[in-house]
């Protein structure tokens, strides 16, 4: 139980606490457990509105759904192909992906509502050398959960995960898609050219994101990072409406780190470091070359309603680079941004 008396908003007094009494909409991620019958099972917690704290405890799992692991899941082990995983998904199975690195010759394609893809350990998905699309493609269906996975770019692909193939009017109010505890890395693994156009693309409406770490690598194996080596335009692109994201970490991308075009978006806590390594100002100009730098958080000019809370944006620049704005949003009454800060930590650049 959260002691709300211990926390108070204090930014108006020079403090650094942002307190939000309840979470507007959330679902905890599924987890593995052993039932009273000795069988492995997966519990999918229920969707919560205006909730506070974790929805389960040691003595009470709370509301939700229990799924038998062996009957309802396919347990993925290293060496299993993307083609075979997709056959299991088509057959109606969920996936529990065990620790290992999985080079995917084709995207894992989720077409059935309420499908779960759950990783344990450092289950890592890699779009293969001949897979220029993505690691996971989720169709615009209700209730899908993607949780506890690492996505690693070793070659070239459009995205690392894509939810919805395009923007539509379809809503998922009662049973939204959940993406939780997902980690994304572009570069750093091997000394070779790596490219992803945009790491995470959300086109469906009502998506819930709970903890993303999206990282264009700034260090790793020698020869694996550099402005022309590991290239990516955007970390996160949100085109869907009514998307809510909690705990967003997004760093070092070469254009807008986060680019939000959907209406009624909400973001709770954002940490972002701009790229270290732009060679010169001419490489880092937005708005068709008319504005110095790229905003770390950009809400498109046509958006009318957006809310965001508790942002920390900073830079460590190797070269003399100017960034005009760390955040860019439309000047409209429906745009509300609370508790924003930025800072230049060190390096040759100025902000």
Sequence positions of predicted segments:
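Extracellular/periplasmic carbohydrate-active domains that bind, remodel
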Residues: 1-351
């Amino acid at each position: 139980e959260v002691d709300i008396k211990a926390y108070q908003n204090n930014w108006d007094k020079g403090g650094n606490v942002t307190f939000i009494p309840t979470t507007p909409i959330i679902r905890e991620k599924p987890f593995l457990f052993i039932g009273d019958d000795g069988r492995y099972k997966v519990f999918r917690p229920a969707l919560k509105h205006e909730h506070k704290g974790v929805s389960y405890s040691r003595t009470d799992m709370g509301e939700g759904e229990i799924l038998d692991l062996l009957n309802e899941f396919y347990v993925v082990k290293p060496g299993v192909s993307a083609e075979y995983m997709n056959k299991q998904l088509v057959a109606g199975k969920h996936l529990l992906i065990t620790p290992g690195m999985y080079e995917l010759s084709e995207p894992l394609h989720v077409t059935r509502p309420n499908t779960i893809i759950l990783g344990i350990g450092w289950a890592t998905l890699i779009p293969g050398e001949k897979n220029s699309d993505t690691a996971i493609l989720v169709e615009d269906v209700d209730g899908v959960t993607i949780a506890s996975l690492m996505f690693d770019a070793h070659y070239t692909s459009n995205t690392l995960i894509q939810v919805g193939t395009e923007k539509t009017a379809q809503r998922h109010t009662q049973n939204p898609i959940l993406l939780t505890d997902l980690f994304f890395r572009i570069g750093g693994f091997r000394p070779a050219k790596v490219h992803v156009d945009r790491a995470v693309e959300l086109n469906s409406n009502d998506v819930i994101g709970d903890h993303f770490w999206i990282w264009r690598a700034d260090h790793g194996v020698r020869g694996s990072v550099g402005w022309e080596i590991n290239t990516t335009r955007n970390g996160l692109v949100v085109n869907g409406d009514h998307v809510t994201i909690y705990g967003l970490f997004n760093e070092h991308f070469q254009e807008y780190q986060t680019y939000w075009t959907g209406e009624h978006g909400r973001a709770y806590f954002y940490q972002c470091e701009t790229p270290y390594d732009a060679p010169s100002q001419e490489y880092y100009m937005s708005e068709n070359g008319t504005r110095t730098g790229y905003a770390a958080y950009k809400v498109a000019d046509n958006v009318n309603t957006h809310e965001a809370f508790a942002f920390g944006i900073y830079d460590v620049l190797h070269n003399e680079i100017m960034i005009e704005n760390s955040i860019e949003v439309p000047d409209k009454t429906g745009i509300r941004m609370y508790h924003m800060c930025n800072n230049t930590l060190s390096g040759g650049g100025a902000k």
